[in-house]
Amino acid sequence: MRYLTITLTLLLALTISLGNRSQAAAGEIQDKLSAESTIETVLKRGVLRVGMSTFVPWAMKDKTGQLIGFEIDVATRLAEDMGVEVEFVPTKWAGIIPALLTGKFDVIIGGMGILPSRNLKVNFSQPYDYTGMSMVAHKELAKGFSTLEDFNKPGVTIAARLGGTPVEAAKKHLPNAQLRLFDDESQTIQELLNGRVHAVVASAPMPAFQALKYPEKLFVPLPENFTREPIGFALRKGDVDTLNFFNNWIGFVEAEGWLKERKHYWFKTKDWEDQLQ
């Protein structure tokens, strides 16, 4: 009986010891995860670093050189709600995901489409916007063109921004056309205005804005967008705390109507156009 009591006592002590060790290990893991969380890092730093690339009307420079646009408003509001400053890190689109993964900034807020190929490299928040691919074309070179089939020919040249979803859309829907890639969309529009390409594939509503800006040279050949894609924040994998916060924040600003109001201002009106350079 005495041996049984001793044995049970030892087993109980061992169980308590193992339990304490497990709790300590769990605590260490939690502390490590918390310490590595982008949210915790941003709060300690006091600055949210946002990777982005300029394209109308998501992000662009006004007459004073300051960044304005839908994504600029979104990132600024996000930082304000976190109680920190925002720092924008302009980055070429083709290298923006590698820059995120190497810690150049904390999050990509730049109209990034949620694609399976991208999701293998980064995590995405829930969508906070939806967009689609459209085209703006040269009036003389693309005279009479009104369908994708008109542009899907070997003699047609299409321009798109390097590294963006327009490239994937052009390859999928216009496989027979010649595709020229550029670092940013301003270059694609300049090539179009110079008559060196038939059309530019880009996210709506940029093509419509360019056609309104240069009505003597450009037009929108398609009656509606030919793709639809969700837009989300991109962040590094494995950071559940940051992903949770971003998702809840998006839900909050959607519920209060702020996102809808900002979308209307930047995508449905031209009240901001006189701010541009």
Identify the residue ranges that each predicted region occupies.
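Extracytoplasmic small-molecule ligand-binding "clamshell" domains
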Residues: 27-111, 120
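A ligand-binding cleft/hinge motif common to bilobed small-molecule-binding domains
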Residues: 95-98, 111-120, 169-172, 193-227
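Short helix-initiation/N-cap motifs at beta->coil->alpha
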Residues: 36, 72, 88-98, 143, ...
